[in-house]
Amino acid sequence: MINGLIGKKIGMTQLFDSKGDVRPVTVLQAGPCVITQRKTANKDGYDAAQVGLVEFVKETRLTKAQLGHLGKNDLPPVRTLHEFAIVADGPSEAESNGEVKVGDKVLVDLFEGSKFVDVTGVSKGRGFAGVVKRHKFAGGARSHGSMFQISGSIGSSAFPSRVFKGMRMAGHMGQDQVTVRNLRILGIDKDENLLVVEGAVPGPKDATVFITMSKKPPRERRGFAGSSTVDPLKASKRAVAKKK
């Protein structure tokens, strides 16, 4: 099976866990998607599947190359395409790769059994921003005649007589590809293809996001929602009692 799919960011809300704590969550429209192309190691050098997000798109909005690519297998017009890796879920890798076929639908039930996902999107654009807003500089003095928002010195004129690469300066802020890792899955709605994850996701509402299974899922932490808490005082007393 493939390790992810394409979705849309619906918006944010909040939920209460079993302990009564508020959890900020993001609702994602995960799919429905369709497999538009199958990449193989023999032909393409690697195993992957090209996936398209099924949504209402006029054929006039697509190029002839896109229409020809989709028309080979009588697929619906899709505008957003993305490649996802194929992970083995069968007794052998060959059998698992053979299960992925062009035209198959990919729905939100792909993430059943998974606890965490990685979400990739494009962050909101903030335009041209100064160093205080862009890099969280403290700024200068707020007294009369001073310039609070100015960045200050960016290099000496004597030596090195240049500006070092990577110098934090004013410039375009946002509109960057951002990946948020290990977002906990709090709910799945199969009927509406909705995925509820804990935390924030880059991008505005209705932004296109790529949802994949977590590459490095974290271990359960003490006191985390859904895990049992341990009283350190009682635990130390039990340890002393065992030694006696």
From Swiss-Prot:
Function: One of the primary rRNA binding proteins, it binds directly near the 3'-end of the 23S rRNA, where it nucleates assembly of the 50S subunit.
Compositionally skewed regions (Basic residues) per UniProt: 235-244
Family in the record: Belongs to the universal ribosomal protein uL3 family.
Gene Ontology molecular function, alphabetical: rRNA binding; structural constituent of ribosome
Organism: Koribacter versatilis (strain Ellin345)
Pfam families with a match to the protein in the record: Ribosomal_L3
GO cellular component, one term: cytosolic large ribosomal subunit
Ribonucleoprotein is among the record's keywords: yes
InterPro entries: Ribosomal_uL3 (IPR000597), Ribosomal_uL3_bac/org-type (IPR019927), Ribosomal_uL3_CS (IPR019926), Transl_B-barrel_sf (IPR009000)
HAMAP family per record: Ribosomal_uL3_B
Example GO biological process: translation
Entry protein name: Large ribosomal subunit protein uL3
UniProt KW keywords: Ribonucleoprotein, Ribosomal protein, RNA-binding, rRNA-binding
Subunit structure: Part of the 50S ribosomal subunit. Forms a cluster with proteins L14 and L19.
